[in-house]
């Protein structure tokens, strides 16, 4: 019998991890940014849930990044937003509450990775997209 979920880890430049979890009984992909230390302890989670269409947009943004253009990827069930900015060969990733966008504050957690690491993240997103039915 296959596992009820699949997870993958993407290690970033600042010792943070983008952690992806797909559960077969849910119609979305969970995305979390946490420190590698928190990953071992399973604490410090900042979570956002993305539907398939949003994951497709995120994958396309990573594979063909528009320079200095902000990508907003909204959670479909809460007010969380995943924000990605590509600038000077780096991708900067934040998770925050939608209301914080108006206030220009309230970032819950953030990380970054280089353009040369992007193909690995694209591979992970493609694997996760294949799990959606």
Label the model's feature ranges.
Residues 1-133:
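Positively charged, low-complexity terminal tracts
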């Amino acid at each position: 019998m296959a596992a009820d979920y699949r997870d993958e880890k993407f290690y970033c430049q600042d010792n943070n991890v983008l952690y992806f979890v797909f559960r077969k009984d849910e119609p979305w992909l969970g995305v979390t940014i946490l420190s590698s230390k928190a990953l071992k302890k399973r604490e410090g989670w900042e979570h956002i849930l993305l539907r398939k269409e949003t994951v497709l947009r995120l994958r396309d943004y990573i594979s063909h990044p528009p320079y200095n253009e902000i990508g907003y990827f909204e959670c479909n069930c809460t007010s969380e937003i995943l924000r990605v900015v590509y600038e000077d060969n780096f991708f900067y990733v934040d998770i925050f509450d939608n209301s914080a966008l108006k206030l220009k504050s309230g970032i819950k957690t953030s990380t970054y990775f280089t353009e040369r690491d992007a193909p690995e993240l694209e591979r992970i997103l493609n694997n996760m997209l294949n799990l959606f039915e």
